[in-house]
Amino acid sequence: MTQSDGAASAEPRELVRLSTDALREFRDRERARYEAIKARATPFNLARGKPATEQVALANQLLTAVATPEQCWTEDGNDCRNYYGSPQGLIEVRRLFAAMLGAPPEQVLVANNSSLALMHDALVYALLTGASDGAAPWRDQHRPIRFLCPSPGYDRHFQICEQYGIDMIAVPLTGAGPDMDEVERLAADPAVKGMWCVPKYSNPTGETYSSETVARLARMGAAGDFRLFWDNAYAVHDLTGRSDRLDNVLDACAAAGNPDRALVFGSTSKITFAQAGLGMLATSAANMRWFVSRQSTRTIGPDKLNQLRHVLVLRDDAGISAHMEQQRRLLEPKFAAVQEVFKARLGGTGIAAWTRPRGGYFVSLDVLDACAQRVVALAKGAGIEMVPAGRTFPYGRDPRDRNIRIAPSFPPADEVRAAADALATCVLVATSERLLADRGVNA
């Protein structure tokens, strides 16, 4: 991930350097452009990281992969149409995703569609029964428990904590992961029990945790029942021909003497069918026993037929890579369109900076302080559906009101380009209004 304010145009056009009269004229021109966009009433959706129809169609073989009774049997003789089998999922599917998760198949669990459900369950099990066998439940701590939340981050992580009354502490990101000096300072508090991490192509900033960051997270002082909720949602989701390197956190934790610290999550939600895929957990052998013993009271087992379909269609690491290359080719032009438009419209203005992600599903846009909510409100008025401003921070509160998450994956590339152009207009209107207000010009 790299951050950009775009290349400067031939003449300096930083808005802050314009005279008040020139800035007022600029604002009025952008307002007129905005009204024209509103009049066209073209709806756009940049709200969520939703795969496009063409992307999910790449996995249509899943629809027919298991078509006869004879195909329903596993290599160890289990009928996938019936009850039971390993609570960790088929050994075939655990082998398939072991490399992606960074663990041997024995330390992998493959469940039903949602990795978010696995994160939720792991947190609730720790809250109610302790984070390891014999440990005190988190809820029985003498002080309210706390979670570290690298921000901007994934809103659904934060919603789990909010749902269960877990205090959240925002930690700034650096471009190579969270500010580790701050993380280490905060984690020394025994009331801090966990940390949310999207370590590769982070949502929404696109950054990948550096080797130093992973090593420090693995070895830092923390409560004995502190857990890294390592949501590796974008493990194989590159936008360029070269994948970012992410160190294996399970190996790093084991080497640091904290083998049970990390819970690694993944899914096929943005690989095959977004809501008919597989969720996964990889962790230490002790943690796996802990999780399975609790999960077994919740469910007899996962959808084995769907696991078998994925094995038959994706086959092996090479099959996953080939499939994701097709995904990349569909996504890359959409992200390129956002970059081209922002460079042309916002470059050199001094009022916006945005990421150029090498993978993942988002572009993170920072505007002038106290402007993000106004930008998103203008976007809504122009028919652009966005995630609410502030949603990328704990409790939905961006302390600087500047971050906006952009999800270009779902619309066609031409619509992404038009939406990015309309959004740029909203940014220019909102920020020119703010600069004028700072000069005492409110009309």
What are these regions (language model features)?
Residues 364-370, 386-428:
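Conserved PLP-binding active-site segment of the aspartate aminotransferase-like
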Residues 325-339, 351-366:
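Conserved glycine-rich beta-strand-loop-beta hairpin in the small C-terminal domain of fold type I
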Residues 111, 251-332, 345, 432:
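Conserved core segment of the aminotransferase class I/II
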Residues 49-53, 115-116, 153-155, 176, ...:
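Short, solvent-exposed loop/turn segments at secondary-structure junctions
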Residues 71, 79-224, 235-257, 372, ...:
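Conserved core of the PLP fold type I
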